[in-house]
Amino acid sequence: MIKAFSSEVDPGSREESASKKQPAAAEITEDGFLGGQLRLRQPKSGHRAGHDAILLAAATPARSGDRVVDLGSGVGAAGLAVARRVRGIDLVLVEIDPDLAELARNNAAANAIKAEVVILDVEAGAAAFDDAGLAPDSADVVLMNPPFNDPSRHRASPDGVRQRAHVATATTLAAWVHVARRILRSNGQLALIWRADGIAEVLAALDRGFGSLEILPVHGDATAPAIRILVRAVKGGRAPTRLHAALLLNEESGVPNKWVQEVLAGKGELPLARR
């Protein structure tokens, strides 16, 4: 059994947390997100947070008082971005890599965001989740950015952390969705991001136990196929699936989409976040 380690970060302990030893991994950079509202320390190489995490956060339908679980949180970018947008959530960051989990803990403290950090393999069994305080029917919202690159078309990185964070196996998505279904309460909300050409995999994984799907395709520009899909699903939902108008990261002229830039700067949310 994989042992889970859980620790809670309280905003009042930010100075003490910041003084703790950082992971002895590669060089660390400090980067601004949400227009500088969120400062995150992360490895200079390997798996780094970017637009995917912030778009996922902007699509997460959380409300104040919700228990929100970020599966595979990395350094905490998506979950902490949700907490910055929606005050008063009970945030849990779940990450398998101890170094990234330590960065997530310090990032939460440095940004004065209260969060529980759990070191746990998302594909661990139910008993490991119970031990970590993530029992069945205990979460209101789950968000996740699982590894989604197709191994048959993507050369795996020699960096083990990067490979684990980016390359999916044949069972990755189904396993992560199964965990979300188990820990969510009835009518709980799931938000996820996946590569657009894998939409059939997403629909298949959500077919058992989820409904009321809302799908938002993300395009680099209007002339190219979608590169990502953002999906919101409801545990036990029965409403018909809705396909939203495409989100264009850049206009046809190549200029960044102004509304998307506002969302990335923390000045707005995506339609999937409204409930």
Residue ranges of predicted features:
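Conserved class I S-adenosyl-L-methionine
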Residues: 65-74
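SAM/dcSAM-binding transferase cores
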Residues: 225-275
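A short acidic, Gly/Pro-enriched loop at the edge of an enzyme's catalytic core
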Residues: 128-141
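Conserved Class I SAM-dependent methyltransferase catalytic core
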Residues: 45, 49, 170-226
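Conserved SAM-binding loop
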Residues: 104-105
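Class I SAM-dependent transferase core
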Residues: 25-63
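Mobile active-site "lid"/loop adjacent to the S-adenosyl-L-methionine
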Residues: 146-175
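Conserved SAM-binding loop of SAM-dependent methyltransferases across substrates and taxa
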Residues: 75-88
